[in-house]
Amino acid sequence: MKLLEERILKDGHILGDNILKVDSFLTHQVDFSLMREIGRVFAEKFAATGITKVVTIEASGIAPAVFTAEALNVPMIFAKKAKNITMNEGILTAQVYSFTKQVTSTVSIAGKFLSPEDKVLIIDDFLANGQAAKGLIQIIEQAGATVQAIGIVIEKSFQDGRDLLEKAGYPVLSLARLDRFENGQVVFKEADL
């Protein structure tokens, strides 16, 4: 997605060897016009697949997932990272390691929001090592629902997340694919959408 790549080049900041900071439009402050376009692009791609739910993980996946779900006219569910006393029965959980935060969290979704009839589109802000998507897949499959595809806003193609997910049989479609960081600049691979 050219608009996203241009925004990454303009406002993204490289930290170290493998971190891209995009807090001015995605991971802290949210550019709603960009998120609306991201949602439109994902929805256009998946409109004919019968998606019934969009699932993400808090926090930075919520904005692109909301706009995708809105464009598809289906509910969006986000997995919670913190235990909530109001979520006390029928909870589906998985362990997820965060590459950026370098911590493992138990993420959860109330089972009443997913059913075996659901066809789920996972949307997330970043794909690095695939652990967030893997955890969401475990939760979705605990409910007996089907993962149709995984939509990623920014993929770090130099890490193994895509390979892990595709080898497990899940299609991955990314709007921006980072090939590498070179001389303080992002070098892109051809995106899927």
Swiss-Prot record:
GO molecular function per UniProt: xanthine phosphoribosyltransferase activity
Catalyzed reactions: XMP + diphosphate = xanthine + 5-phospho-alpha-D-ribose 1-diphosphate
Superkingdom, natural source: Bacteria
Gene Ontology annotations of biological process type: purine ribonucleoside salvage; xanthine metabolic process; XMP salvage
Chief place where the protein resides: cytoplasm
Keywords of the record: Cytoplasm, Glycosyltransferase, Purine salvage, Transferase
UniProt EC number: 2.4.2.22
Residues that coordinate or bind xanthine: L20, T27, K156
Pathway: Purine metabolism; XMP biosynthesis via salvage pathway; XMP from xanthine: step 1/1
PANTHER family in alphabetical order: HYPOXANTHINE/GUANINE PHOSPHORIBOSYLTRANSFERASE, XANTHINE PHOSPHORIBOSYLTRANSFERASE
Known role: Converts the preformed base xanthine, a product of nucleic acid breakdown, to xanthosine 5'-monophosphate (XMP), so it can be reused for RNA or DNA synthesis.
Subunit details: Homodimer.
Family, as annotated: Belongs to the purine/pyrimidine phosphoribosyltransferase family. Xpt subfamily.
Protein name: Xanthine phosphoribosyltransferase
